[in-house]
Amino acid sequence: ACDDDYFHDSGLANGRHDCTVWEYLHTDAYNWDSTILVIERAGLVDLFDGKDPACPEITFFGPTNISIMQFMYKTVDNDDKVMYERIEDIPVEMCRKMLLSHVLPKKMMKKDFDYENRGTLEGGTYIQALSGTELRVFRAKSSYMGIADIGAESLGIHALVNGYIVGIADIEMNNGIVHSLSYTYQFSEL
């Protein structure tokens, strides 16, 4: 028999934070410090801090630092030279347009989106991002032990023909919801 106790109860994750989206992003430099710099460069701090009267609540499909770094290192000119070595090198309007394509004009939790029709690129919820980009956001159930639709539920986004996976959904703040995009996502305009 085993005498060692290798189980460590780390508790339940708390998806609710008593702060603004802007303040929340500052609590996790590992994932969000580059995102913060892009928001500042785009002049969108008030939007993320809940101080924009035209849009007091938001949903943010958040590109993490890794997503932004991939964009910077993979965006090259005709001579294969990296175009953006620092966030300050990215044009302000590009930062603004890319960020706004990740923002919805209201709070939406995972449960607020419809399911995708399995095996199709249809179903889900169609909604316009603040950039004007039409998004299809959908829930999908995976299989478990060979049985369809009883496994983990995920959240995904389609914009035109590109599809992206949400890494962590339903992080709620006072003025918004953050759905953190997976580390495989490369920051772009959706």
Task: Name the predicted role of every residue range.
Residues 35, 61-68, 170-189:
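FKBP-type peptidyl-prolyl cis-trans isomerase
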Residues 66-81:
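Short active-site loop/helix that positions an aromatic residue
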Residues 20-57, 62:
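Post-signal-peptide N-terminal segment of Sec-exported extracytoplasmic proteins
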Residues 3-11, 34, 76-77, 93, ...:
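Intrinsically disordered, low-complexity linkers and terminal regions
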